[in-house]
Amino acid sequence: MPTVIGYHEIKDAKHWLSSPKREELFGPLGVTNIRTFVDAQNPTRAAVLMDVPDLDAFQAAMQTEAAAEAMNYDGVLPETLVILLER
């Protein structure tokens, strides 16, 4: 199962860390082992590391309105999102 990293900027680290939206969006896709990271020097930079069983389904889900709504709720700045795939 490939590991995926989503790196992006956020508005508020405390809110982002406590949000249930990651599990709500990625859980039905079978995504597991979701871990969160925040830059200690700049708390507006954050990342999610997760195991993704189906990259095509994951990438399709990231293009949906549900993903846009989850990112908005979480305070993610979508224009800063970079997805890194394990190779």
Where are these regions (language model features)?
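Short S/T/G/P-rich N-terminal loop/turn motif that feeds into the first structured element of a domain
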Residues: 1-87
